[in-house]
């Protein structure tokens, strides 16, 4: 027995030793790719020495003899910290993910190839001015210099993910950066999804008057009546099965509910306590680990600029110089139209146009798939744009037999100069120069908020399609592509883009809300990203005569829900007082406890409170009950509560209370009936998910920010090292916006919000502050992978200074790039 025991101990010891060696070896391999920030590197294609000074928050301050060398340094710094992120985004826009990830990403690649964004990016290089092209070339050379260093010094292939996904890394090219701007346009444009959803809902609803309830317009003057979609595309079934967008974390395709959002506001000097203009900006995008944002400072010949960049794109997209500050918010401009193209019944290679049938423009495209046979696609284009497969965006449900769907979209411009406009903005010294730079900007359309030392302004930038006043659906639903009135007629002049310059009140801002109320076709959009946050913002701005940097920070971090304050009195009007206290343990008693909590609640979506969870679960269950009857399976796609819909129903606007009656039941249900039943539904769900002690609930447990790694975030064990999860306040409709997932077992997970926050005070520009939601590094073993995450969660910031001495005071490291001598 003793012998057996000794052998078991030896085997166990051996296994432990092997495990330790394995873990140690894996750590050693992964850690090889951690960048050495205190380093001197000899590189090619550099005219003079470049210094990358990383301050104590690891923000690189890049100094060089000329702009070309500075952009070279930015490329090197991006590749040091975010190489895997950069090449993954490049593969995404190229439609080449399947070369690395196999069949799991084929569906994503198929659709990206249809858009053909990378080919358009290569073509767009010809439209760029020499200065922009030189900057892109220099940036690419900086990225490639880091790749050369990795190969020469065997630095763990540059990122730990490279050890798991064996694929060659092609040199960076200027077109890659242009393509990433187009990829951002894809992620921020949701009108294609919205058009198809409106068409499907129109087909499903027996009463077309109810379409204005479930898909309400933002408050403002109305529009002319539109035809039913069944009239535009006859012969379609009332209901069709949903084909969801690709669920892969790598998918760039977003529903309209999860397209871009953002906040930005500015104060003139006479509304600022310091006497200088103020600006705040927090762009909202999907959360990832690392965040898409990367902080950097570039010391250009025109002066220093500092702010948020996106690795792969050599531009400060939101930030400031010593003279100008700028922020971006999604404009929600209607820059996409879906067209139903009729095939020639005698020749499927042709489609109908206003002048007769015409052949598709076609070419083959081959998708290489890891561990599988390659796939050959035939890409087809019409005059209106690329033909998209019916298997995406539910296009099959709204496309009659003998037809195909095509998309026109401003981002499909083969002479896209958006990146040149962004570079010109970095050199602008005044608001007027900043506005002028936006004329070259194409997509994605944004509201550009600007301040200089004297002036504040907001300008919508990006191409706005010129539509015919006789357009059948006004761009709100797919329309026949062979009718001339439905086709785009070019681009509206830049002067037609909304502009607000030095408003009399001294305050301006945007929360993706409706900015103008103009009749079609000069309307900008019928769909807007916000009707709620703007109300709270207006209240905060008006309650003070003068503002400070800190009051702007308070507004960015505000968690009071205007929506909760307005909806709860409406839906609970007949439920608050229901007689005597019910016995403990009964559903009636649980309902009374919930209502008592909500009655004393201020509407603050604080992570430590139970009321936000009760409220959110209640209104979610309420919308489900209201629409399930009429929409059937389509109701699942309305996965975020629309406050305007709930309000219309409970105020019975134009007969909207009809949604409260269940069509399949004999009794006539009322809206208070629906509210009571929905509250019971919500409490049952809460009990099953979080327990029955309502007073002990925490909103933050359900509303965790999910910064998940896009490729390894679902891998057991690794996900605990890669993913960054944080309990957070806020919600769908608070200024501290934490957009919820809306579906699945954790519908209130915070998946979309402000990955970057910045507030700039031009009375003392170097007192400006900014922060991102994870950290600068994309390497999970780096201290700088998540060091900013807790600051971000607590509402704290780091200094945003152009003071060179401050950057050099306690640097993380200084990387010197030295030109190679022949």
Kindly label every feature range from the protein language model.
Residues 10, 23-278, 283, 289, ...:
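Substrate-recognition/specificity elements adjacent to catalytic centers across diverse enzyme folds
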Residues 259, 300-315, 319-324, 328-481:
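Glycine- and hydrophobic-rich flexible loops that cap the catalytic core of alpha/beta enzyme folds
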Residues 523-587, 676-822:
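Terminal end segments
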Residues 1-18:
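N-terminal Sec-pathway targeting helices
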Residues 70-73, 111, 119-136, 406-408, ...:
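Second-shell loop/turn segments in exported
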Residues 617-700:
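Charged, long alpha-helical assembly modules
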Residues 64, 69-101, 327-378, 485-533, ...:
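Gly/Pro-rich active-site capping loops and adjacent beta-alpha segments
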Residues 388-389, 403, 441-544, 604-605, ...:
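Hydrophobic alpha-helical segments
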């Amino acid at each position: 027995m003793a012998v057996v025991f000794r052998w078991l101990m030896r085997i166990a010891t051996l296994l432990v030793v092997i495990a330790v060696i394995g873990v140690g070896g894996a750590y050693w391999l992964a850690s090889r790719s951690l960048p050495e920030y205190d380093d001197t590197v000899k590189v090619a294609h550099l005219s003079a020495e470049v210094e990358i000074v990383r301050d104590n928050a690891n923000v690189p301050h890049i100094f060089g003899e000329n702009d070309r060398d500075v952009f070279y340094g930015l490329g090197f710094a991006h590749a040091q910290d975010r190489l895997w992120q950069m090449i993954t985004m490049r593969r995404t826009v190229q439609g080449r993910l399947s070369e690395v990830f196999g069949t799991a990403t084929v569906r994503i690649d198929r659709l990206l190839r249809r858009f053909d964004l990378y080919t358009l990016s290569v073509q767009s290089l010809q439209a760029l001015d020499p200065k922009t092209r030189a900057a892109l070339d220099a940036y690419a050379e900086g990225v490639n210099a880091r790749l050369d260093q990795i190969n020469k010094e065997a630095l763990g292939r540059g990122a730990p993910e490279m050890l798991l996904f064996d694929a060659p890394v092609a040199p960076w090219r200027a077109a890659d950066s242009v393509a990433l701007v187009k990829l951002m346009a894809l992620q921020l444009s949701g009108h294609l999804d919205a058009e198809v959803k409106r068409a499907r809902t129109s087909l499903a609803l027996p009463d077309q008057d109810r379409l204005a309830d479930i898909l309400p317009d933002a408050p403002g003057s109305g529009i002319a009546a539109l035809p039913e979609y069944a009239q535009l595309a006859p012969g379609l079934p009332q209901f069709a099965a949903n084909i969801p967008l690709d669920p892969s974390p790598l998918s760039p395709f977003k529903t309209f509910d999860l397209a871009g959002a953002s906040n930005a506001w500015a104060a003139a000097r006479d509304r600022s306590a310091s006497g200088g203009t103020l600006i705040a900006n927090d762009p909202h995008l999907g959360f990832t680990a690392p965040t898409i944002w990367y902080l950097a400072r570039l010391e250009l010949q025109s002066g220093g600029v500092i702010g948020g960049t996106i690795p792969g794109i050599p531009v400060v997209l939101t930030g400031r110089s010593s003279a100008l500050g700028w922020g971006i918010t999604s404009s929600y401009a209607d820059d996409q139209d879906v067209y139903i193209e009729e095939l020639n019944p005698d020749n499927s290679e042709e489609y109908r146009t206003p002048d007769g049938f015409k052949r598709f423009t076609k070419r083959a495209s081959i998708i290489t798939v890891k561990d599988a046979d390659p796939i050959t696609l035939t890409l087809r284009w019409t005059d209106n744009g690329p033909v998209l497969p019916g298997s995406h965006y539910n296009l099959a449900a709204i496309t009659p037999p003998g037809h195909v769907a095509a998309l026109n979209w401003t981002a499909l411009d083969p002479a896209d100069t958006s990146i040149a406009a962004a570079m010109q903005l970095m050199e602008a010294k005044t608001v007027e120069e900043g506005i002028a730079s936006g004329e070259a900007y194409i997509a994605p359309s944004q509201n550009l908020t600007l301040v200089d030392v004297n002036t504040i302004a907001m300008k919508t930038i990006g191409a706005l399609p010129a539509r015919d006043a006789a357009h059948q659906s006004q761009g709100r639903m797919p329309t026949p592509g062979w009718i001339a009135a439905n086709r785009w007629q070019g681009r509206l002049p830049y002067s037609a883009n909304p502009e607000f310059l030095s408003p009399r009140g001294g305050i301006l801002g945007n929360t993706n809300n409706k900015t103008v109320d103009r009749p079609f076709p000069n309307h900008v959009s019928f769909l807007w990203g916000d009707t709620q946050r703007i109300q709270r913002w207006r209240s905060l701005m008006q309650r003070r005569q003068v503002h400070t940097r800190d009051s702007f920070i308070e507004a960015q971090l505000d968690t009071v829900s205007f929506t909760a304050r307005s909806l709860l009195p409406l839906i609970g009007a007949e439920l608050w007082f229901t007689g005597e206290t019910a016995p403990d343990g009964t559903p009636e008693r649980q309902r009374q406890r919930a209502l008592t909590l909500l009655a004393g609640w201020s509407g603050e979506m604080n992570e430590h409170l139970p009321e936000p969870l009760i409220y959110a679960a209640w209104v979610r269950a309420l919308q489900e009950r209201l629409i399930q009857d009429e929409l059937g399976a389509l109701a699942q796609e309305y996965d975020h509560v629309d406050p305007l819909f709930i309000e219309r129903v409970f105020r019975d606007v134009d007969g909207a209370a009809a949604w409260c009656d269940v069509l399949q039941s004999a009794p006539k249900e009322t809206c208070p009936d629906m509210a009571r039943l929905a509250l019971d539904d919500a409490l049952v769900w809460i009990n099953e998910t979080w327990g029955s002690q309502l007073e002990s609930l925490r909103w933050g447990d359900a509303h965790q920010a999910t910064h998940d790694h896009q490729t390894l975030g679902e891998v057991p064990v690794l996900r605990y090292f890669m993913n960054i999860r944080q309990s957070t306040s806020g919600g769908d409709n608070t200024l501290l916006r934490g957009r919820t997932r809306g579906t699945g077992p954790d519908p209130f997970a915070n998946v979309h919000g402000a990955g970057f926050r910045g507030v700039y005070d031009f009375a003392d520009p170097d007192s400006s502050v900014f922060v991102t939601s994870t950290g600068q590094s994309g390497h999970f073993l780096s201290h700088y992978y998540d060091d900013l995450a807790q600051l971000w969660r607590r509402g704290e910031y780091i200094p945003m200074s152009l003071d060179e001495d401050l950057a050099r005071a306690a640097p993380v490291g200084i990387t010197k790039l030295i030109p190679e001598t022949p």
